[in-house]
């Protein structure tokens, strides 16, 4: 099994490359000329996308071909103060540059919209805003000329009336979501409400790929064993153009601490690989969700090189052969 590692949003090594520079609503309101305010937002968004391109070039130098882009590329997007703003036209050139570089170097990029995207809410306004956010990500991907399928990982949402009711509300709500947006979605288990079994119920029923978060699973599960569950997870990816992906982080202290450590516990990851087996999939993409970002990836590669069952094949990929 070949394992490709990626990391999230920004580099700890590359200086002055934040992809999420912003402007507050208060700052925007102080600009007397509304159009001038929008132009300033566009300049910030262009800077963010320029830094995204710098990050992808940094990744190329380290043979990292899997990366999660920041969802905060365009400040004040979908805010009432910027209603009607055609931001995607203003940043078209920058979006295209990012997409061309990613495609040229066969990089997989995706997003993880924030926790305000809730698709199982009974409140129509929350659902409307959630779909607005998905449409924003869709526009970014289309501007990059990247296939939008399975590029946005989401959590199921809240459980105000219980887990079962939350799952059924998700199914009901997705019936009215445009196919173009629904096809973007991957679903991830969380550490508070919905276990991997719950997420699989939706993934199998709605044909949505399921992303296993190992750390979340360790914190919240019905059965900690993944031997039976893993093949069901893999099956949800059968119709996807992308390899199976999982999320990897380590607890700050203790096995069930939901807080993320700066780095990754290699022993826990190796134990997971032995549990699912070397023949589980041919290719596995692993998104590292550690506070030290790319530095955590580099350290994990060093740590994994010490295991007999691991063969390092690039600066960001290994082969697992127990």
From Swiss-Prot:
Listed EC numbers: 3.-.-.-
UniProt-recorded Gene Ontology molecular function terms: endonuclease activity
Cited Pfam families: UvdE
Protein keywords: DNA damage, DNA excision, DNA repair, Endonuclease, Hydrolase, Nuclease
Which InterPro entries would you find in this protein's record?
UvdE (IPR004601), UvdE_bac (IPR023520), Xyl_isomerase-like_sf (IPR036237)
Segments traversing the membrane: none
Q: Does the keyword DNA repair apply?
A: yes
Q: Under which main EC class is this enzyme filed?
A: hydrolase
The answer, when asked if DNA repair is one of the entry's keywords, is: yes
Q: Which domain of life is it from?
A: Bacteria
Q: Name one GO biological process term.
A: pyrimidine dimer repair
| HAMAP family assigned to the protein according to its UniProt record, in alphabetical order | UV_endonuclease
The family note in this entry says:
Belongs to the uve1/UvsE family.
> Function, please?
Component in a DNA repair pathway. Removal of UV LIGHT damaged nucleotides. Recognizes pyrimidine dimers and cleave a phosphodiester bond immediately 5' to the lesion.
Protein known as? UV DNA damage endonuclease
> What gene name does this entry carry?
uvsE
